[in-house]
Amino acid sequence: MLLSWYIDPDILLKLGIATLIGMVIGLERELKNKPLGLKTCIVIAVSSCMLTIVSINAAYHFPKYYRIMMDPLRLPAQIISGVGFIGAGVILRKSNDVISGLTTSAMIWGAAGLGLATGAGFYKEAFASLLFILISVEFLPWVVRKIGPDRLQEKDIRIRMSLSDKDKMTEILKEMKRRDIKAHSVRIDDLGEKDFPIMEVKVRVHKNRYTTDVYYDIKAIEGVVGVKCDTL
């Protein structure tokens, strides 16, 4: 059988749409300086689309010659599992116990899913899903922050303080409250291994309040020797 270089225009259309979808998702992540970029998303979407095309076409092509029954969606099912490993690679646990990369991991899985849908010929469904994903990631959080509960208007800061006198801990917490710095978690380290007792506090403040301002407020409290602040 002679090798033919002819490619079905419908296949080229599917690959082109998958490229466009991957480009949109990749740009959204790259503009936010996330580990998932433009090239990665395009590769995932196009590869998923291509493997879906191969799987479906092979399932209906080879039985004519070899009488082999094949599941047209067997290969795409393995894509979802394989992409999961890539998604796990962008989930990070930072030193301040904050988990990041979950949305990026979900976007990887989404790019693969949209590539599968495109490869199977569901163009309109793929574009509709892309639109809903972008609305959910970009627009919906802004709306929720505007009309949602006050908790969404706050941010968490972890403060580690060295104290000159362990008997002033309660007074320091009361003074923090007067300065509108609400503590919701307190940890005390006074095992005698350090020169000063340590108090670690997780606080909530308005999201527009600078972490440096919180630092200055804590530093000004009587009995506080040293301060370390981390925005969570």
UniProtKB/Swiss-Prot annotation:
Residue ranges annotated as transmembrane are: 7-27, 42-62, 72-92, 102-122, 124-144
Loss of this gene results in the following:
Cells activate alkaline phosphatase during sporulation; the same phenotype is seen in the sapB2 and sapB10 mutants.
Q: Name one Pfam family in it.
A: MgtC
Q: Name one GO cellular component term.
A: plasma membrane
- Where is it predominantly found? membrane
Q: Which InterPro entries match?
A: MgtC/SapB/SrpB/YhiD_fam, MgtC_SapB_SrpB_YhiD_N
Give the UniProt subcellular location, in the record's own words: Cell membrane
Would the keyword Disulfide bond turn up in this protein's UniProt record?
Answer: no
Q: How does it sit in the membrane?
A: Multi-pass membrane protein
Q: Which UniProt keywords apply?
A: Cell membrane, Membrane, Transmembrane, Transmembrane helix
The UniProt family comment states: Belongs to the MgtC/SapB family.
Xref: PANTHER family? PROTEIN MGTC, PROTEIN SAPB
Can you name this protein?
Protein SapB
Question: What organism is recorded for this protein?
Answer: Bacillus subtilis (strain 168)
